[in-house]
């Protein structure tokens, strides 16, 4: 078997070459050994090449010039030879060939060598990123210089391991690393998250980047940061971007973003309902969720609106809208604070809202005010108003909706099946219905001719509207929205003046003031009393609950009051006091014997120094401490 010997290529030279010109120098102690091992013939080492390359020998300068065109493998071999030459000639003065040695790849596309990875790089600190990052006092002195380099998206940040490890399991598990490469997180999101880790305050979050910040907080296991980012973004939500935030939350399965978008849509339900680009793109389940949140969030509270004296009937008919408008100084909404046992002002009626003769009701946990007596015009005469105002208790703000088709005073405003109904008015039989999604009023079946000039009381029960009124005798009318028609209902045997009518558990409860017409004054004394009747809406029968009841603590001359149902109890609110009437459920509905009922012994009091009539209603108020504490009334 023959031994393979590398071929030798000989080139004739005109003169001997000295080390340092075209050949690589060798150390003195290895020079003899090298010549013995690498020169098997009598020729000089500069003329012998033991490689298999057939190319002629090159000088150091030519090798540097050809490094750009050589493959990476050849250039890496040349780099090793050059490094050995640097070691051998470290003590010698710098030669021209050293200046020609390339320090970096000539092209940006060329990959860096092993030695270039080891070169120190200039890293960006948190304070060099445009906006200063709030750092708690003492962090720098306690932890010293940053000891962690975080690489993301081709950029680097410096931080302290101890700070990040204390707030994230992700960084705690990688505390041994000095350089940490993070994937799946943008540089902007990482910068905001690091600033939050140092300061505990999330700044710079917007609806267009909140998704990547929350996703980055989850990836880096910063649970508190995700919630703080959502809270910082929430005030920036609007009708223009709420659906995009919701879509991003659903697409990336970010619960915090979904909840924030749903919360905004629920808090601004009417605006979302009128916006087809938002409400029209929601599924049926999402629409039900928004309405459930709107109706169930918060705590149901007893409220009362103090309106002008026009709404208080001294006789069978309310006052005419003619005459000067009264002062609106007392036109406000009060909330009963059960913990403190007192009424406190919640909000005041907006500027321009009629405080006399208007109707009010609650729809979608909004308070609506419609109609009334407008302030006197240039001629000094007051006229009915067609304005409609809306109060949102969640945002504590008033707004206007589309006006009525016809101006009305002494109007009855009711909410039924997601619509508003404006029934009658003084000397009016027409009825209008408001669709909040279309923001439009339309006419429906009017009251029957000859019914009554003014509807005194109105209530909704079992999906129908009941209206009571009349001067010489009372009539009870029922409106069926499915048939769009009015029907006559049986009336009670009482001929007393009615204070109010309210619906509860399928019944209509009517409160009459005894002795108001001089019939039962002798029986109850000079102070009078209250008789309660109820009407079973399905059986169409009246029964008597109580006769000549005296509200506890009521003054000698019982003033008219208004009623509202809350938690199975009927609250009777007036300027003289607030009483709770609890109907008894012992007797079956429709029987000849009344079910009974009584007032609770402890009255709740009433707002002090309030003129006009108190119209009670129920709203769900958000759970906020000290809400409405502008001052005890």
From Swiss-Prot:
Q: Does the keyword Phosphoprotein apply?
A: yes
Q: Where is the composition biased (Polar residues)?
A: 35-60
Q: Where is the BTB domain?
A: 146-206
Pfam families, from UniProt? Answer: BTB, Kelch_1, Kelch_6
> Which keywords are on file for this protein?
Kelch repeat, Phosphoprotein, Repeat
Source organism, top-level taxon? Eukaryota
Phosphoserine modification sites are 70, 73, 92, 95, 107, 113
Q: Where is the composition biased (Low complexity)?
A: 61-73
Where do the Kelch repeats lie? 317-365, 366-418, 419-463, 465-506
Keyword match Repeat: yes
Q: Where is this region: Disordered?
A: 1-118
Instruction: Please give the name of this protein.
Output: Kelch repeat and BTB domain-containing protein 11
